[in-house]
Regions:
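Feature detects intrinsically disordered, low-complexity acidic/polar segments
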Residues: 1-162
Length: 162
């Protein structure tokens, strides 16, 4: 029986930038909501102060406005904490992402060093020399060696993808 082949696609730099931009936009949106709510609270406080100055006694209406301001203040606090939490998570994800990218880069570098080892470089140099000399049999032999090296390389890359 044959198993299904699954393809894992590493997100491209462009995808990562888009994701980061979306996260930044969400953070900015959260901050903007908090700013709007803070301005609304300030306006309500100013109105309440004005109402209190005009009246000798604090009535039911002023108490309701005070409750409303306190409610909005708690909502603002909740929004700010939520935005901070999301921002903190974004930073953690970026750190993980960066370490993941660094790890991938390191693996790729090791693979490239393995692939383009001295033997491969020697084969390529010999091939260049054979092109100048036009030695058909020697060139054929070098092409076979190069093909074998490339087959090994392909297998190594497949293993890296798994």
């Amino acid at each position: 029986t044959k198993t299904k082949t699954f393809i894992y696609k590493e997100p491209s730099t462009e995808d990562l930038i888009k994701k980061k931009d979306i996260e930044n936009d969400k953070t900015k949106s959260g901050i903007n909501k908090s700013i709007s709510l803070a301005e609304e609270i300030k306006k309500d406080i100013d109105e309440l102060n004005k109402a209190i100055l005009e009246k000798k006694k604090i009535g039911w209406e002023e108490k309701e406005k005070t409750k409303n301001i306190l409610k909005k203040q708690k909502e603002l606090e909740k929004q700010i904490k939520n935005t901070q939490k999301k921002n903190s998570e974004n930073l953690k994800n970026k750190e993980k992402l960066n370490s993941s990218i660094l790890e991938k880069q390191k693996k790729l570098e090791e693979l490239m060093n393995k692939v383009f080892d001295e033997e491969m470089k020697k084969l390529l140099k010999e091939m260049e020399e054979m092109m100048d000399k036009a030695d058909k049999e020697k060139l054929k032999d070098l092409l076979e060696k190069l093909d074998k090296e490339n087959t090994d390389l392909e297998k190594e890359l497949d293993r890296e993808l798994e």
